[in-house]
Amino acid sequence: MEPWPLLLLFSLCSAGLVLGSEHETRLVAKLFKDYSSVVRPVEDHRQVVEVTVGLQLIQLINVDEVNQIVTTNVRLKQQWVDYNLKWNPDDYGGVKKIHIPSEKIWRPDLVLYNNADGDFAIVKFTKVLLQYTGHITWTPPAIFKSYCEIIVTHFPFDEQNCSMKLGTWTYDGSVVAINPESDQPDLSNFMESGEWVIKESRGWKHSVTYSCCPDTPYLDITYHFVMQRLPLYFIVNVIIPCLLFSFLTGLVFYLPTDSGEKMTLSISVLLSLTVFLLVIVELIPSTSSAVPLIGKYMLFTMVFVIASIIITVIVINTHHRSPSTHVMPNWVRKVFIDTIPNIMFFSTMKRPSREKQDKKIFTEDIDISDISGKPGPPPMGFHSPLIKHPEVKSAIEGIKYIAETMKSDQESNNAAAEWKYVAMVMDHILLGVFMLVCIIGTLAVFAGRLIELNQQG
């Protein structure tokens, strides 16, 4: 294949590019020969520059609950017509649009009114698209840090209402009129956040007048966003562990008191919960404006564990009581031994023996029998001469002392068994009560908000 056709094609393309560049160069030179970027682009100074504003939300970067700052990545689309930048495409080789630096032309000085921490105005001056009709489109990117009142009452099942208020800084409505491109911001290129989802968004125009100049309107466009937090992270890492700690606390009452491990388990649960709370405390918004739901639940869990320790001490104290230190009141015996076990069907729990040693140790007569079992002499009364013998009398006194000692020991053992039985009944009752309180407390903290969110859809 001959190389000259390729050379010819390359030469024609190069000539076209040079010619096109020449047309654009002449056009730019002509447009900006006497152009001033500080003068409003109108034919008559009484005319109003109409600026159409559109907000494209790209990313929700951060929501700072403590400082109440929402950081977003946006593109601020602005369109207007510049009377001084029109041309006839036929005079410039058919060039209908060009890209020029935004610093060279007049621009509406739009700023974020509710700026919290950052630049009020746009700092990235990208190029604008200029058409032969004078229509200008400028879409600069910006990182906005806007103030938003963060209400953490329902955290982590919360919704936040935030807004971005845009307007010109120096121009009032009589010289520059701003209008929203749409009643909603553009979310077509929005990158989903792992923590927030935008449920609702809208935009509207405001016109405000002040007492100093009632005939002069000041315009702004406010974009409003309703953001709902995705709570899965907090459910898995905070709520479920706290719930498990609560259930583990209830199991303290399932552990037998005789094992001696009740207090060990209770203190271990408390220490584990304390370390856990120290680890996750940074996940909770540190604000004093309100106590979030998750903070209430963590407080409930801590009180729940401490209450179990206090009650465990009482149960252990009850278990180790004895007649020498405590006398069981009749109401305790009636409630915890006679009534509650029957009501709660504690049939498997062996009740303490309450038989009293009220038999007479001695009878009026003493029957003396032979060791071999053969009948002995007739019974002798207390007035028998043999009974009055000193050695026999001493033996009888010894037998009487032994019997009374055995009776006292038996009564002491029965009383101690009753206290242990009362402690066992208390354990069974508290096991059910604490498990029930754990479930009811969890539902009381979160159920109301979850039902409300479900009704909202």
UniProtKB/Swiss-Prot annotation:
Catalytic activity: K(+)(in) = K(+)(out); Na(+)(in) = Na(+)(out)
Location relative to the cell: Postsynaptic cell membrane; Cell membrane
GO molecular function: acetylcholine binding; acetylcholine receptor activity; acetylcholine-gated monoatomic cation-selective channel activity; transmitter-gated monoatomic ion channel activity involved in regulation of postsynaptic membrane potential
Gene this chain is encoded by: CHRNA1
Annotated disulfide bonds: 148-162, 212-213
Disorder named in the UniProt entry: Multiple pterygium syndrome, lethal type: Multiple pterygia are found infrequently in children with arthrogryposis and in fetuses with fetal akinesia syndrome. In lethal multiple pterygium syndrome there is intrauterine growth retardation, multiple pterygia, and flexion contractures causing severe arthrogryposis and fetal akinesia. Subcutaneous edema can be severe, causing fetal hydrops with cystic hygroma and lung hypoplasia. Oligohydramnios and facial anomalies are frequent.
InterPro entries reported in the protein's UniProt record: Neur_chan_lig-bd, Neur_chan_lig-bd_sf, Neur_channel, Neuro-gated_channel_TM_sf, Neuro_actylchol_rec, Neurotrans-gated_channel_TM, Neurotransmitter_ion_chnl_CS, Nicotinic_acetylcholine_rcpt
Signal peptide range in chain numbering: 1-20
Main location: membrane
Membrane spanning stretches: 233-253, 265-285, 297-317, 428-448
Protein name per the record: Acetylcholine receptor subunit alpha
Membrane-protein topology: Multi-pass membrane protein
Outcome of mutating residue 275 to A: Increased length of channel opening
Organism: Homo sapiens (Human)
Cytoplasmic side, ranges: 254-264, 318-427
